[in-house]
Regions:
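Residues lining hydrophobic/aromatic ligand-binding pockets adjacent to catalytic sites
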Residues: 1-140
Length: 140
């Protein structure tokens, strides 16, 4: 399963044996984990959005500059590569698509809480539109 979450829940994500993968342009200095910058916002429009806080502007630019330039199959393969070779072999030997395998657990993480505007929600929507189940990991 592919989840979305945020850095404040990193410890709990790891305790659930879910592989965290940052999808932000710049991670916290203390974060030493996996990063996938191909799903991060472009610095220029991100800084412009920080000034104007226009979510429609952000959505338009993120879609056009990031998501429209990504292939879902390549993104899934890149995420799959965060698993160890042994894990990959185990997952591949099942007879279902690997992103549906119960052992394929990744959390795409960034900074914002679930209720806040965040590009990870746009990434999740894009994946869902491409037939990949994604949900926000709710941890109390």
């Amino acid at each position: 399963m592919i989840y979305t979450s945020y850095f404040a829940k990193l410890k709990q994500i790891e305790e659930l044996n879910i592989i965290p993968v940052s999808i932000c342009g710049r991670c916290p200095d203390w974060y030493k984990g996996n990063q996938y910058k191909k799903l991060a916002p472009n610095y220029k429009f991100f800084m412009e959005w920080k000034q104007n806080q226009d979510n429609d502007f952000y959505i338009e630019h993120f879609q056009k500059e990031i998501l429209d330039n990504r292939n879902i199959d390549i993104v899934l393969q890149d995420l799959f590569n965060f698993f160890s070779i042994d894990q990959q072999e185990f997952i591949k030997n099942s007879h279902i698509p690997y992103w549906m395998n119960n052992d394929f657990n990744i959390a795409l993480i960034c900074y914002e809480k679930p209720s806040d505007f965040c590009h990870r929600h746009l990434v999740a929507d894009w994946m869902i539109k491409n037939g990949i189940p994604v949900k926000e990991l709710i941890i109390k």
